[in-house]
Curated annotation (Swiss-Prot):
Keywords: Ribonucleoprotein, Ribosomal protein. The keyword Transferase does not apply. This is Large ribosomal subunit protein bL32. One of its GO terms (cellular component) is large ribosomal subunit. Residues 1-23 are annotated as: Disordered. Belongs to the bacterial ribosomal protein bL32 family. InterPro entries: Ribosomal_bL32 (IPR002677), Ribosomal_bL32_bact (IPR044957), Ribosomal_zn-bd (IPR011332). GO terms for molecular function: structural constituent of ribosome. GO terms for biological process: translation.
Length: 60
């Protein structure tokens, strides 16, 4: 089992954790609806990059 030879100082501990912060999500505005959404996802109205992707069919 690996055991540290020396105690890691508060400064070095915090420098090690500097990349652990939560980054803000990238939010874009939908071209068709104008709503906020995550990039590379289908919008609420089933459009992607301004084009309809899924067309709802009537239940038979």
């Amino acid at each position: 089992m690996a055991v540290p030879k020396r105690k890691k100082s508060k400064s070095r501990r915090n420098m090690h954790r500097s990349h652990h912060a939560i980054k803000p999500k990238n939010i874009v505005v939908c071209a068709t609806t104008g709503e906020f959404m995550l990039p590379h996802n289908i919008a609420v109205d089933n459009s992607y990059k301004g084009k309809r992707v899924f067309i709802k069919q009537k239940a038979e």
